Amino acid sequence: MARYRGPVEKIERRFGVSLNLKGERRLAGKSALEKRPYAPGQHGQRRKKVSEYGLQLNEKQKAKFMYGVSEKQFRALFVEAKRREGNTGTNLVTLIEQRLDNVVYRMGFATTRRFARQLVTHGHLLVDGAKLDIPSYRVRPGQKIEIRESSKNNSQIVRALELTNQTGLAPWVDIDADKKFGIFTRLPEREEVVIPVEERLIVELYSK
C-alpha cells in the first residue's frame, strides 16, 4: 500500500481519534474531528461493530497514517522489532520513533510529521553536521539534528517552535530553540510515548 496523500482529517474522523495530522488546527480547536466527531459518509454517525480482525487492522492503519509510513516500511519495522530481544510491540514503537522525520517532529521543528518529512526530503536538515534527506533514517542516541543555516528563518519552523510552549517536548530530546538544533538524548520508554495505538493488536495481526 502506497503512502496516503488524500484529505488527512477524514482519516481522523474515520478512526475517531486525533492523530495530529493537522497540528495547528487541532491546537486551535478547529479540527474536523472536533467539529464532526463521527466517520465521514452518509452513515458515518452510526459506527459499526468491528470484528477482532477489524480492530487489529484499524490499529495498524492508525499507526501507519499517524507516522506516515507505507505498508512495506511498516512491515520491515515489525520484522526488525520481532528479531530484537524484548517485547515486540515496544520494540516496534521504539523503532518507529527513531525515524528521522519523527524525531524532527518530536523536537518541535514541525507541527506535523508530514511537514517534518518535507523538511527532511527538501534538504533543510543536518544530522551530525552532514546533510541528510532520508525520512526513514534511524536516529541514534547522541546524534545532533540541526536546521540548515539557510532555513533557520523559515516561518513554518519558527511558528512550530513557538507552539512547543503549548505542546511541550518529548523528554528524550533536548533542543536549543534559538540556534535551532536538538539532540536525540536517548531511546524513549514505552510509557513516555503517548499515542492512540495499541501495538499489541498490531503484533497479533502480523503474527497470524
From Swiss-Prot:
Q: Which Gene3D superfamilies match?
A: Ribosomal Protein S4 Delta 41, Chain A, domain 1, RNA-binding S4 domain
Q: GO MF annotations for this entry? A: rRNA binding; structural constituent of ribosome
Q: Which GO CC terms are listed, alphabetically?
A: small ribosomal subunit
Keywords attached to this Swiss-Prot or TrEMBL record, sorted alphabetically, are: Ribonucleoprotein, Ribosomal protein, RNA-binding, rRNA-binding
Q: Which GO terms describe its biological process?
A: ribosomal small subunit biogenesis; translation
**Keyword Cytoplasm carried by entry:** no
Q: Which PROSITE patterns match?
A: RIBOSOMAL_S4, S4
Task: Kindly give the CDD domains that the UniProt entry links to this protein.
Answer: S4
User: What domain of life is recorded for the organism?
Assistant: Bacteria
Which segments constitute the S4 RNA-binding domain?
98-160
- The answer to whether the entry has keyword Ribonucleoprotein is yes
What InterPro entries has UniProt attached to this entry?
A: Ribosomal_uS4 (IPR022801), Ribosomal_uS4_bac-type (IPR005709), Ribosomal_uS4_CS (IPR018079), Ribosomal_uS4_N (IPR001912), S4_RNA-bd (IPR002942), S4_RNA-bd_sf (IPR036986)
- Using the record, list the residue span of the signal peptide; answer none if the entry has no such feature: none
Q: List the disulfide bonds.
A: none
Q: What family, per the record? A: Belongs to the universal ribosomal protein uS4 family.
Q: How does it assemble?
A: Part of the 30S ribosomal subunit. Contacts protein S5. The interaction surface between S4 and S5 is involved in control of translational fidelity.
Function of this protein?
Answer: One of the primary rRNA binding proteins, it binds directly to 16S rRNA where it nucleates assembly of the body of the 30S subunit.
The name on file for this protein is Small ribosomal subunit protein uS4
Species for this entry: Sulfurimonas denitrificans (strain ATCC 33889 / DSM 1251) (Thiomicrospira denitrificans (strain ATCC 33889 / DSM 1251))
